[in-house]
Amino acid sequence: MRSSAWALSLACLLALVLTGCTLNTTAAPTAEAGAAISGIVHGGQNPIIGAHVYLFAANAGVFTPNTNGYGNASVSLLTAGTGRTQDTTPSDPTYLDYYVTTDSNGNFSITGDYSCTAGQQVYLYALGGNPGLGTGTNPAAGLMAALGNCPGGTSAFATGTPFVFMNEVSTVAAAYAFAGFATDAVHVSSSGTPAAKLGIANAFVNAQVLQTSGVANAAIPPLTAGSGGGDAPQAEVNTLGNILAACVNSNGTGSACTTLFANAESGGTTGNPPADTATAAINIAHNPVAAVGTLYGLSMANAQFSPTLMGQPNDFTMSIYYDNSLFNDFGALAIDANDDVWFATDYVFKLNGQGYDLTGYNGYSGFNNPYNIAIDVNGNAWALNSSAVGKFSNSGTLLSPTNGYNGLGLSTPVSIAMDASSNAWIGNYGGGNVVKVSSTGTLSGTFTGSGLSAPGPVAIDSSGDAWIADESSGAIVKLSNAGVAQSGSTGYTAAVLSTPTGIAIDHSGNVWVSNSGGTNGSVVEISSTGGLVSSSTGYTNSALGNPGAIAIDGAGNAWVADPNTISEISPTGTFLSGSTGFTVSNGYNSIGIDGSGDVVLNYDVYNFQYTNPFYYMQVMVGAATPVVTPVSLAAKNNTLGTTP
C-alpha cells in the first residue's frame, strides 16, 4: 500500500509536466486547505522512533534585484494543534516551528488542518529520534522528502492521503533536486518571480524522478507514446544514501558523523559544518569534488542500500540520461522561458526538463535538416540549416516559409543568437560574414568588420552588441547592433586564442571564449571593452582538452563542455570542478542551464552491439545555480548570468 499510494502521487506529478510548464504572470496565489499526509521515517532499514517531522514550503520571497530572496528561511506550515509540538530550543534551526513525532514504528501522521499557497513547493524534514539504539537519540539525523506542489485543493495530492517514505535515499533525491535553491535543510527559497516558481517546481519533480517510496529509481519509463525513457543514477543515489546512513544509524557523536560533517561543510572541507545529515547532503551536492574518497569510504562501512557504485567516483555530480528513439542526431540545444529544451536534429524537437517529448512523433516539421537553434524573447525558435534559417512558434507552427529565410549568400551558417528585438544574428561561415535577420524575416548585412573572415560562435550582450569568434584568425569581433565593427581592424586577441569554439557573456558584460587550439584547451575571459580579464593564456587545467560550447549560470560561473568532461569555472577563474573536471559521457556539442539549476547536455554514444549511435539528453541535476532563460530574454533585461 505504501508504494502504490506514493506511486499514484508521482504519476500525477509527472502527468503535470508531460505537457510542459508554462509561465503564468496573471494568476494570483490563493491559499488552499492542506491535505492529510502520513508516512514513515527510516534510518537505513530501521524505523526512527521519536523523530520530529516538520512540514516546510520553499520560501518565495519578495523580489529584490540581485538578491532575489535566495537564502531565506523555509516557511513552516504546521501550527498549534492536536498532536503537534513547538520547538522551544533557541539554538535549534527549527526554533518555534511545530512538528509531529514518529511513533514506535517510525510512523507519523499530519492532519489536513494547515494551509499552503497554490504553487508552493512543499517538503518534509525529520530531525533526531532513535534509529535503533538501545537508549538515547541521534540529534544529527536529518532526513527529507520532497512532496512538490502544495498538497491540497486541486493539486496532485488532493485525490488521497499520500504515504511518504522518508529515508536517506529520499534525502539525497531532495538535496540534489533543489540544491540550486537551498542553503541548508531549513533554508530553501527563491525570488517568487514566475520564472523562479517554475524553476523550483521543476526541481521538485526531479526528486520524484530520482526515487520512489525511498527506493532509488533505475529507469525512467516512458509515460506517453513517443516520450523518451531513460536511466536514473540508482547506484550513485544509493551510495550517497549509504554515506548518510553511516551517521544516521548512530548516536551522532562517532567517527561516521564527525568524518561526514568535516568533509561536507558549506564549502566542501571549509566553511560552516552541517548540523545534520540532510544539510550534509545539500553541501555534497554543492561541492561534488570535495573529499570524494573520504566520503565514499563511509559508504562501505555498513551499506543499507544497493546496488551501489562499483568503485570510487571522480565526483558526486548526479545525472539523469533521457533517451529518445525519435532523434536521428543531436544538434545544438536551446532552453526557453518554460525551461523546455529545444533540439535541432534534422527536425526541430522540444522536450521538457524531464525528457518527455512535447512535439509528437516527427517533431516540428516544415523546415528540413536544421542543426543549430536559438530562442527569441517571444519564445519562438529559430533553426539553422545549411542555407537558411527557419522560425517556429513556441507551439511548433512554422512561421517562416518552408525553405526558411535565405539570401545574402547564406552558406554553411554555423551559429545563431537572438537580440532584444528578436533579430537573428547568424555566423555565416561559408560566406565569411555575419548576416542579420529581422523578426519578420528581412535579411541585412553582410557584416565583415574587424577582419572577420570565418565566423564561428555568436553571442549578444545586454547592450545589443554582437560578439563573434573568428575560427580562422582566433580574434573576437564586436559589432554594434547596426553591424558596425567596435573592435578595431583585427578584433580582440589573446596569445592563446587560435581556434575559438564557444562563446558566452556574463552579467558584467565579460565575454567567455572556449579555445580548442594549442597543446591544451583554454577559456579566455575578455572585458566588454576588449581587455583581457584572464591572463593571455586563459584559464587552463588538465580537464580542458578540446573545450567547446559554454554557458553561464546564475552565479556567473562558466560551464564548459569537453568531449569527456564538464568544467565549471568561477568568475575569478577558479576551477570549481577540480583538476579533472566533472566526468560525463562523450560526444557533447551543446550545453545549457535552466531555471532549476540543471545543466543540460546532448550527447551521442556508439554501442559496439549496434551500428547506429544512441542519442541522449543528459541532465546534471541541481549542479548549477538557476539562471534566467532564454539567453535572449536575459540579454534584453540585463539579467545575463543571474538567478530568476
State each model region's role:
Residues 1-10:
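Bacterial N-terminal signal peptides that target proteins for export
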Residues 70, 79, 83-88, 109-228:
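A non-transmembrane, solvent-exposed segment enriched in polar/low-complexity residues
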Residues 23-151:
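Beta-strand-dominated extracellular/periplasmic modules and repeats
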Residues 42, 56, 103, 111-113, ...:
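A structural detector for beta-sheet-dominated domains
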Residues 17-20:
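C-terminal motif of bacterial Sec signal peptides marking the signal peptidase cleavage site
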Residues 12-14:
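Cleavable N-terminal targeting peptides that direct proteins into the secretory/outer-membrane pathway or into
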